[in-house]
Amino acid sequence: MKQILIISGKGGTGKTVLTSSLAALAKAAVLADCDVDAADLHLLLHPVVKGTQEFWSGQKAVIDDGQCINCGRCLSLCRFEAIKALKNQDGSLKKIEIDPIACEGCRVCYYTCPVGAIQMEDRLSGLLFISETKYGPMVHAKLGIAEENSGKLVALVKQKAQEIAQAEGKRWLIIDGPPGIGCPVIASLSGVDLVLVVTEPTLSGIYDMERVIDLAAHFGVLTKVFINKCDINWDNTRTIEEICQKRGIEVIGYL
C-alpha cells in the first residue's frame, strides 16, 4: 500500500477537488479526509456513513454549585476569561460559572479552589466516520466547535484508513490533508510515501507553497507540485516552475 498526501500551504487552492479527481481515477483505493477542522471531501464524494466513533480529547473544568462558596478566587486567576460571575439584581454575587467553549483546560482553577468545588471532566471533541463511496471506503471526521487537538484526530483518521486499506488489500491510500503547516499537517505527513502540493499562481500561493515544501523536506518526504488555476497569471506560473526547478521538485500537472 502506498500513501499519497495532497496538501497546500493555504486554503482555497483546490486540493480537495484534485483529491476527489484522483479518487475517481484510482482503483483499489481508500480515501481519508484529514482536514478535520473544516472537512469538505464528503461534499464531493457523497459518502454513506457505515460507522461512527466518538473522539474524546482533553478535559474542561466544571463547577459543583453545591460546593462552591463563591469566593471568586478562580475568577481572578483565569487567564482565558472562561469563568464568569453572575450577579443578582441588587449587584450581589449569585454564582460562578465556567464557559465550556472558552475553557482551555489549564487546571489553574482546579488546583486553587479552596473547597475542591471544581472538577476536570473529559470532553467529547469530535466524531470520526467510516463511510463508503462509489470510489471506495472513506474515513473522515468532524471536530467540535472551539475544540482543539485536531492533530490527534488526524492521526486517528489515518490509522483507521490504514487499517481498512490493509484489511481489504487496497493498493492506495489517498489523503486529503489540511491547509497550512501546523500540527494537523505534520500529523498528516507521518508515514506517507508522496506529498503532492497543490498551489496557485498568486503571491500568497507561491509563498505558502514554499513553506509547505520546506516542511515536507524537513521530514524527508518525496514531494511533487501541481499548479491549479495556472492561467490566471502566467508570470507567477513560470515563477513556480523556476522555484521547483531550483529545488529539484517535479511539476506533474496543470489545470
Please provide the spans of the model-predicted regions.
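Flexible beta-alpha connector loops of hexameric P-loop NTPases
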Residues: 142-151, 203
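Extreme N-terminal, non-catalytic leader segments
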Residues: 1-10, 28, 32, 43-50
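Conserved catalytic-core segment of NTP-binding enzymes
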Residues: 90, 115, 120-130, 152-254
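Short beta-strand-centered segment that lines the nucleotide-binding/catalytic pocket of NTP-utilizing
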Residues: 28-42, 121-127
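Walker A (P-loop) phosphate-binding motif
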Residues: 1-26, 66
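P-loop NTPase switch/communication element
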Residues: 39-58, 130-131
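Iron-sulfur cluster-binding cysteine motifs and their immediate structural context
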Residues: 73-98, 108-124
